[in-house]
Amino acid sequence: MSKAPMRVAITGAAGQIGYSLLFRIASGEMLGKDQPVILQLLDLPQAQQAVKGVMMELEDCAFPLLAGMVATDDPNVAFKDADVCLLVGARPRTKGMERADLLTANGAIFTVQGKAIAENAKEDVKVLVVGNPCNTNAFIAAAAAKKVGRTNPNNYHGMLRLDHNRALSQLAGKTGRAVSSLKKLVVWGNHSPTMYADYRFCTSNGDSVKALVNDHAWNNDVFLPTVGKRGAAIIEARGLSSAASAANAAIDHVRDWVLGSDEWVTMGVPSDGSYGIPAGIVFGFPCECKGGKFSIIQGLEIDEYSREKINFTLKELTDEAEAVKDML
């Protein structure tokens, strides 16, 4: 007997990342090749015509798993009975805009969306914020949702998987090992140049990746800056921000969360106080996923260098939380 469709809400549906996401979700890459989906597409009133065009293309693919579509500019309609929400749409930073202004502009958007999700989505909804600054946007959405109740505030995540995948690729290049052989990578902190990609526990076919690299200068001066500033490098090269790789990371995050994974994965999740991170701050942690639930991997040793890096990215996040506290 075929499964009941799952409802997936996507904001910013007419945008570049949305366009890279929708066809892969409809083909079963995110929730499984036997799981029908209904896509609930949210975008601004002026983008509705473009959303209609994307829906026409989705129809023309004749995806067996695509059980229905809804297009709307009303968050209450978009999030109705949603099982998964991908919050892609966000106010981009424009020239001359201060980070504080960006936080305030997005704060308004994610307060509305967090409330609408909590009031309308399924109680066990899984929410992934892709739109930047994604950690703090997730923090804001979770705070708005908490006021309503119903949904689990721990299920409001920020996307660190893109940093994780970028780090894997750089390590594969450095070690000459296949990406698929690399296990137990961790990315701590904010999705920003302050993130800390940590391969101290990482292995490749049983070998220590730290021992294979064995180059502190490369780690500090090449690896971490390359991963941290990769988004800017792509804009420089392509003239547009990374859309397909961001969409791919979102699919990876939700797939592992819903379907489970035997691997360590990096997820931006509300802290429970682990590793000295204040409760509620949405922070990149090593996680494992089983049975539709995630848990933070405990007991990892934090050396002096790592603590310094973790504290640096934490400071950025606590500053952001402070900047938006009046909106919460």
UniProtKB/Swiss-Prot annotation:
GO terms for biological process: malate metabolic process; tricarboxylic acid cycle. InterPro entries: L-lactate/malate_DH, Lactate/malate_DH_C, Lactate/malate_DH_N, Lactate_DH/Glyco_Ohase_4_C, Malate_DH_type2, NAD(P)-bd_dom_sf. It comes from the Bacteria. Substrate binds at R93, R99, N132, R166. Its EC number is 1.1.1.37. Keywords: NAD, Oxidoreductase, Tricarboxylic acid cycle. Pfam families: Ldh_1_C (PF02866), Ldh_1_N (PF00056). It catalyses: (S)-malate + NAD(+) = oxaloacetate + NADH + H(+). SUPFAM superfamilies: LDH C-terminal domain-like, NAD(P)-binding Rossmann-fold domains. The active site is at H191 (proton acceptor). NAD(+) binds at G12, A13, A14, G15, Q16, I17, G18, N106, Q113, V130, G131, N132. GO terms for molecular function: L-malate dehydrogenase (NAD+) activity. Belongs to the LDH/MDH superfamily. MDH type 2 family. Catalyzes the reversible oxidation of malate to oxaloacetate. HAMAP family: Malate_dehydrog_2. This is Malate dehydrogenase. It comes from Dechloromonas aromatica (strain RCB). The gene is mdh.
